[in-house]
From Swiss-Prot:
One Gene Ontology cellular component annotation held by this UniProt entry: ribosome
Listed name of the protein: Small ribosomal subunit protein uS10
SUPFAM superfamilies documented for this protein: Ribosomal protein S10
Annotated keywords: Ribonucleoprotein, Ribosomal protein
Any Pfam family: Ribosomal_S10
SMART domains hit by this protein: Ribosomal_S10 (SM01403)
The organism's place on the tree of life at top rank: Bacteria
Stored HAMAP family: Ribosomal_uS10 (MF_00508)
Length: 104
């Protein structure tokens, strides 16, 4: 019977893809430095949210403006993490615009 591999799955979300990519690079570098084997970043589909707003507060229903937000997502898997890896990831300082979900 095969031994179960321990895995940490990190899911990152951000509106700015450059900020997201630099955060992924920092996590991968930290994992490699501490002896774990990272897989990724794996890009997930970008979610587009479009808002339609009337330009005028009173009349002119035909005049509308569209705004859009794009949410970029990435997944990182870290196999065989040591306690040193987990401590380094907890102490890692990442930008404020990145949402992080961690599953063990």
């Amino acid at each position: 019977m095969a031994a179960l591999q321990q895995k940490i799955r990190i899911r990152l979300k951000a509106f700015d893809h450059r900020l997201l990519d630099t955060s992924c690079d920092r996590i991968v570098d930290t994992a490699k430095r501490t002896g774990a084997s990272p897989v990724g970043p794996i890009p997930l589909p970008t979610r587009r949210r479009i808002y339609c707003v009337l330009r005028s507060p009173h009349v002119d229903k035909d005049s509308r403006e569209h705004f859009e937000t794009r949410t970029h997502c990435r997944i990182l898997d870290i196999y065989q993490p040591s306690p040193k890896t987990i401590d380094a990831l907890i102490k890692l300082d990442l930008p404020a615009g990145v949402d992080i979900e961690v599953k063990l």
